[in-house]
């Protein structure tokens, strides 16, 4: 009658040797070569320790209703101006022109965070006035909270000029975050939670655009208005105001941050284990070859059966 294999299992052998033997030394060397080189390979391949990482978050942005406007009324340097800063308005004297401003923020997806700002400024003009360019600063409160809590006062600069006088400037863009250094992974950071412009200052240098921009760019974290297609509309009736319309969106940002210890360890462990598995497989085959073929002298024998041990 033909016989068929119904079950099989490997026979385990035990290889014994004294402590002071070549076999023991071989095992120690194999252990060192199995676990240390993967660590060196992972470390030397760079990126072993995760120095920076990124995550996505929509910031909590709110318009602060602080505005500084300079409208160029000629190509030779004349201008009209207005701001929400009393010190600046006192300094511009007869160049002050009071505009009409409307601003509305929208939360389109109803998640509790504003998604965009609709801003409109109407600057009244005399029939003989012309506008050749504008420089407009809007300020915002900007907050991140998914990892660390980061709070700052930021700004958007709207700037455009043309040799042809205009009736309207239309901007549609994103308020983008710019980082020179990553944020912390936890804690509270209010380093830049200070006004972009000191509203209590009476000095003209405080309101000079070069000084404002220079001071702002010293920050490691800023916002900038990215509006690649500004629209300058010409042709204004004598009684019409000059109009600035801006749609400023608050997009989801990719935030760079310094990961914590456990996150760095998790990332390093994944790299180490992926290389270690290869070394374990290779040196396991080497050990099988050495001991099965008695390259090094050992005493071999089967491992006692657990069932027989209980019977005895």
UniProtKB/Swiss-Prot annotation:
GO terms for cellular component: ciliary membrane; ciliary transition zone; MKS complex. InterPro entries: TMEM231. Glycans are attached at residues 193, 220. The keyword Membrane applies. Part of the tectonic-like complex (also named B9 complex). Belongs to the TMEM231 family. This is Transmembrane protein 231. It comes from Xenopus tropicalis (Western clawed frog). The lineage of its organism: Eukaryota, Metazoa, Chordata, Craniata, Vertebrata.
């Amino acid at each position: 009658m033909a016989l068929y294999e119904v079950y099989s299992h490997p026979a385990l052998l035990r290889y014994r040797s004294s402590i002071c033997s070549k076999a023991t030394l071989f095992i120690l060397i194999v252990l060192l070569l199995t676990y240390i080189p993967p660590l060196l390979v992972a470390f030397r391949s760079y990126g072993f320790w995760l120095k920076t990482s990124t995550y996505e978050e929509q910031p909590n942005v709110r318009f602060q209703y602080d505005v500084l406007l300079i409208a160029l009324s000629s190509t030779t340097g004349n201008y009209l101006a207005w701001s929400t800063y009393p010190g600046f308005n006192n300094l511009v004297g007869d160049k002050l022109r009071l505009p009409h401003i409307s601003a509305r923020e929208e939360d389109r997806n109803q998640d509790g965070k504003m998604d965009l700002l609709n801003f409109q400024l109407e600057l009244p003009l005399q029939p003989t006035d012309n506008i050749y360019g504008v420089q407009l600063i809007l300020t915002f409160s900007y907050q991140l909270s998914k990892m660390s809590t980061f709070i700052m006062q930021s700004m958007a600069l709207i700037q455009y000029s043309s040799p042809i006088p205009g009736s309207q400037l239309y901007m549609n863009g994103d308020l983008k975050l710019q980082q020179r250094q990553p944020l912390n992974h936890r804690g509270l950071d209010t380093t830049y939670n200070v006004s972009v412009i000191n509203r209590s200052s009476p000095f003209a240098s405080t309101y000079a655009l070069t000084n404002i921009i220079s001071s702002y760019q010293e920050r490691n974290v800023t916002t900038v208005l990215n509006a690649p297609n500004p629209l300058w509309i010409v042709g204004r009736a004598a009684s019409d105001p000059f109009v600035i319309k801006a749609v400023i969106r608050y997009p989801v940002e990719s935030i760079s941050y310094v990961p914590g210890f456990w996150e760095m360890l998790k990332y390093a462990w994944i790299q180490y284990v992926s290389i270690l598995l290869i070394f374990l497989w290779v040196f396991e085959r080497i050990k099988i070859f050495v001991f099965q073929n008695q390259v090094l002298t050992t005493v071999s024998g089967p491992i006692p059966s657990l069932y027989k041990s209980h019977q005895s």
